[in-house]
Amino acid sequence: MGRTTILFLFAAVCLAQAPTAEQSLSFKSPGTARISPDGTLVVYSVREADWEQNEFVSQLWIAPVSGGAPYQLTRGKSSAGNPRWSPDSKRIAFSTSRDGKGQIWLISPTGGEAVALTNEEASPGGFKWSPGGKRIAFTSAGPEPKELKDRKEKYGDFEIYQEDYRQSHLWVVDVPEEIPAASKHKPKAVAITSGKEFSVGGFDWSPDGTRIAFSASKSPLLIDGGTSDIYVVTVADKAVKKIVATAGPDSGPVWSPDGKQIAFSTANADPYFFYKNGRIGVVAAEGGPVQIVANEVDEDIGPAEWRKGGIYFSAWKNLENGIYKVTPGGRAVRLLASTGMSYMGGSLDETESKLAAVAAKPNAYPELYVVDLTASNPQPRKLTDFAAQYSKHNPANREVVRWKSKDGAEIEGILIKPADFDPSKKYPLLVVIHGGPTGIDTPLRSADGTYPIERFVAKGAVVLRPNYRGSAGYGEKFRSLNVRNLGVGDMWDVMSGVDYLISRGFVDETRMGSMGWSQGGYISAFLTTNTSRFKAISVGAGISDWMTYYVNTDITPFT
């Protein structure tokens, strides 16, 4: 059953002012935002639909912190992403495949022609500027081995499952003051790590630029993600030392400002980490005992930045994603809690006086904000106006609803209803179930993605998006409720939510449907064999047979 079946479950109601499906998909939305080290500009990505290429494309924009109109920085048919400011705020490195293969490019924040820095056979992955701004480190699988090239020429291009992977390693490239746009001769990158022992993931430069801390697992295969440990490599002589090795995954290292310690994400030696709280560990740069910080935050967390003021990170608290700060030995403090906003990441300027982030309040669209953290009562100041593109339309409203599941578990969800909602009327109900299971639905408005929610509502339906057991935002105990109960407990949560809305009197229970992707698809599939109350169910990328899933998946520990 597809989306067309779902759409015709109900009659068209009140189409005036509602965006069309094409308009809903065409609305622009902000993404990654990073403030310049000098605190004067913010670079951020904007996603929009390219109907000719049949895909979403993101480009980079600049917003002046002092105010003024934002301006577009990159253009073209290929997306530009992962912007990184040089330490002197004069250049931005970003990734794009505009020449056919993903490479690292450079551009001035004032505009002009972007130039490619790298010309690697294997596209670079993550990258970071060195503290002095003279070099950039990145991850890459490097050139294709000769034996693999010979095999392709002789037998064709195929892959031997779980054998033909290539380890990702650290590379460093010098950044010249100028790179002629037309030049095919790019600076030569040098491998800093090598071999078959590990595959590099996240990394961070030491403050003095002489070392790089990185995480690495046995291989790049998903099933080996739990083997990730923390290492330090000296750039000059390429000497590698493992400094953290626990039973669970350790990843995402960041250096302390004095270069003496490293913070990282850790499962705290727990191999059963899928539903457990990820913690922040701190270890001496030379290795030693690991100290766990911010243990009082009951959510899955990891360090984003370590500055003089402390370790900054984000964490969900119910339906809000907040920004926190903690110092080793201290308790975590939530910043900007009084603003009532949910922050999608964030970045700090060099002095920690300004914070830039994409954020939103309930029933509002995400916008780019900047906050003066030195103010007595810091408040976000909006730099963009994405909401203006919705001004001619009458978008649906979001309401947070709560109910008790079959076993007494407290469940939250988002009820999406027409702007002219009348509780005395009967509406068809569509249940849209997120994936994960550690995803989360919030009362924020957003441009339509997988499902045309605004069209569903414009056609006369109400939509329930349940945060069933296992969802993010409600702590480790809540996530553990579907352990050895997957599908069953989730179904209780969905159906008890449906019953709750029916009890409020505005749901036509003869016209109900369900849909979801991944874990949401699995729950929808589970509903097909456990209830006949839905007229239509759509299963997207959902597990329908655990036995075939186990023998085919590359993440067997999830089962």
Predicted regions and their residues:
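A flexible loop/linker signature enriched in serine peptidases of the S9 family
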Residues: 46-59, 74-81, 93-105, 113, ...
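Hydrophobic beta-strand positions that form the internal "hydrophobic ladder"
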Residues: 39-42, 92-93, 117, 133-136, ...
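Serine-hydrolase catalytic core recognition
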Residues: 344-559
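Short loop/turn segments that connect beta-strands within beta-propeller blades
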Residues: 64-68, 108-112, 175-178, 234-238, ...
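A short helix->beta-strand "capping" segment at the edge of beta-propeller domains
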Residues: 17-28, 70, 184-193
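Beta-strand-rich domains and repeat architectures in extracellular enzymes and scaffolds
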Residues: 22-58
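Residue-level detector of Asp-centered blade-edge/turn motifs that repeat once per structural unit
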Residues: 37-38, 87-88, 131-132, 207-208, ...
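Conserved beta-strand position repeated across blades of beta-propeller domains
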Residues: 34, 84, 128, 204, ...
